């Protein structure tokens, strides 16, 4: 750790004036970026949304799929051709953990690499780089919830993300998360409740609880006697909190107690992201998903019985190594049967460091893309069916903002995660409104204020 006198500290603070942050990937990365932005603004720096106008550039990266990595590497490579001598470039996020110091070999112009478990070290790393002129790297494996979340610079004024658990212990064979974010670490419930109360006092209406597997919350700290559903009951008592969401769930860990909480708690939205990944038992076993199709469907049936109006989301991967056409058809039939409200569909790409990387990627790319397109087309018909079912219904909408394309309209979401547009002004932003649906456009419902 460096020790600086007052003159050196003054030089360091004068060395950086504006910063730029680009975020790739999931909601966890978005929250991590908000925390880093808060640190930098507390340091006295000004945020710029133009990378050419900043002398500190931070790229918060994603490794979950090959395309995400290639986008980042392409962007960072171009910066090496144009970088000014004063600019400092940092790489944070999952790529930092996955590639570590090899990033310096491929991209010698970057100045620091900061892992997902080290974002609280951002200012210390900047001080080291500025004082020494040398590259710096921190990519610890273990995470402690010691970050000052209360000083995070939120991107939204209505909705906020709150981290409750980090890491994952499931080790699906295709997934880098256990290697980039470490093992599961739950955050103390009193700290979560404190942050949520703080956000509500600032005017936030909706909180989304984040974790790679929120259903594992508290299982690593049984002495707390606070599992995920227990936490939700405590959050429901916070005055002024209108809505609570959560993501993501692992099918193995979702409990009857959680389903009953969704049914009973006024704040908890009736939407569950419930990743299937594949509709073939053999493929699921090869993925190490630790459930069968039959067990998955049992959970879906139980959830729909307890919460009849629940909306389900999912993730599905096509073209996993050795997947046959018949096994793909099993996935296709399940997608058609369950009729997800939201589906994120992907073709498989090998990720370095995962067990699946050792297997031959034997499904040709054109076959992967054909299967993906067939699922996308099916899901489009399901989306159409869902949208038509809303016609004539009156739904509760949390108004989030003016519509970007037509400022005569405002945009909000229903409790089940549907986008809604209707006529209104700034006075409606942040309020709950009843809206009658009369039409739809692509993924958006259209309505009239009641």
Swiss-Prot record:
Residues 17-131 form the MTTase N-terminal domain. [4Fe-4S] cluster 2 binds at residues 168, 172, 175. It catalyses: N(6)-dimethylallyladenosine(37) in tRNA + (sulfur carrier)-SH + AH2 + 2 S-adenosyl-L-methionine = 2-methylsulfanyl-N(6)-dimethylallyladenosine(37) in tRNA + (sulfur carrier)-H + 5'-deoxyadenosine + L-methionine + A + S-adenosyl-L-homocysteine + 2 H(+). Its cofactor is [4Fe-4S] cluster. Binds 2 [4Fe-4S] clusters. One cluster is coordinated with 3 cysteines and an exchangeable S-adenosyl-L-methionine. Keywords: 4Fe-4S, Cytoplasm, Iron, Iron-sulfur, Metal-binding, S-adenosyl-L-methionine, Transferase, tRNA processing. It is an enzyme of class 2 (transferase). PROSITE patterns: MTTASE_N, MTTASE_RADICAL, RADICAL_SAM, TRAM. One of its GO terms (cellular component) is cytosol. Residues 154-385 form the Radical SAM core domain. Its main location: cytoplasm. It is found in: Cytoplasm. Residues 388-450 form the TRAM domain. [4Fe-4S] cluster 1 binds at residues 26, 62, 94. Its EC number is 2.8.4.3. The keyword S-adenosyl-L-methionine applies. GO terms for molecular function: 4 iron, 4 sulfur cluster binding; metal ion binding; N6-isopentenyladenosine methylthiotransferase activity. Catalyzes the methylthiolation of N6-(dimethylallyl)adenosine (i(6)A), leading to the formation of 2-methylthio-N6-(dimethylallyl)adenosine (ms(2)i(6)A) at position 37 in tRNAs that read codons beginning with uridine. PANTHER family: CDK5 REGULATORY SUBUNIT-ASSOCIATED PROTEIN 1, MITOCHONDRIAL TRNA METHYLTHIOTRANSFERASE CDK5RAP1. HAMAP family: tRNA_metthiotr_MiaB. Belongs to the methylthiotransferase family. MiaB subfamily. Monomer. This is tRNA-2-methylthio-N(6)-dimethylallyladenosine synthase. It comes from Protochlamydia amoebophila (strain UWE25).
């Amino acid at each position: 750790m460096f020790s600086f006198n007052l003159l050196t500290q003054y030089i360091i603070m004068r060395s950086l004036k504006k910063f730029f942050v680009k975020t790739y990937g999931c909601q966890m990365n978005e929250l991590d970026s908000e925390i880093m932005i808060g640190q930098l603004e507390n340091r006295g720096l000004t945020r710029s949304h133009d990378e050419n106008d900043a002398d500190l550039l931070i790229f918060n990266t994603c490794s979950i799929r090959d395309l995400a990595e290639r986008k980042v590497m392409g962007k960072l490579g171009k910066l090496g051709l144009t970088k000014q001598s004063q600019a400092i470039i940092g790489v944070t996020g999952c790529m930092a953990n996955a590639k570590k110091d090899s990033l310096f070999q491929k991209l010698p112009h970057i100045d620091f690499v900061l892992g997902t478990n080290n974002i609280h070290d951002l200012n210390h790393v900047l001080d080291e780089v500025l004082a020494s002129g040398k590259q710096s790297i921190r990519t610890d494996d273990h995470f402690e919830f010691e970050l000052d979340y209360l000083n995070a610079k939120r991107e939204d004024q209505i909705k906020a993300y709150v981290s409750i658990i980090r890491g994952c212990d499931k080790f699906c064979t295709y997934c880098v998360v256990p290697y980039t974010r470490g093992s599961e670490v739950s955050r103390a419930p009193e700290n979560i409740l404190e942050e949520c109360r703080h956000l509500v006092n600032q005017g936030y209406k909706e909180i989304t609880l984040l974790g790679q597997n929120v259903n594992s919350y508290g299982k690593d700290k049984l002495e707390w006697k606070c599992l995920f559903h227990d936490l939700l009951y405590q959050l429901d008592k916070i005055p002024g909190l209108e809505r609570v969401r959560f993501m993501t769930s692992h099918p193995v860990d979702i409990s009857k107690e959680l389903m009953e909480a969704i049914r009973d708690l006024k704040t908890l939205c009736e939407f569950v992201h419930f990743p299937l990944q594949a509709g073939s038992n053999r493929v699921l076993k090869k993925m190490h998903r630790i459930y069968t199709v039959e067990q998955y469907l049992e959970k879906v049936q139980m959830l729909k019985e307890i919460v009849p109006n629940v909306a389900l989301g999912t993730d599905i991967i096509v073209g996993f190594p050795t997947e046959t056409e018949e096994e793909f058809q099993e996935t296709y039939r399940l997608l058609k049967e369950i009729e997800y409200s939201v589906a994120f569909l992907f073709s498989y790409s090998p990720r370095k460091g995962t067990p699946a990387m050792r297997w031959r990627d034997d499904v040709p790319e054109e076959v992967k893309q054909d299967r993906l397109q067939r699922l996308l087309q099916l899901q489009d018909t399901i989306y159409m069916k869902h949208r038509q079912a809303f016609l004539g219904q009156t739904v509760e909408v949390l108004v989030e903002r003016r519509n970007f394309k037509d400022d005569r309209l405002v945009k909000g979401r229903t409790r089940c995660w549907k986008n809604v547009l209707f006529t209104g002004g700034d006075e409606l932003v942040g309020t709950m409104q009843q809206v009658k649906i009369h039409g739809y456009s692509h993924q958006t419902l259209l309505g009239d204020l009641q």
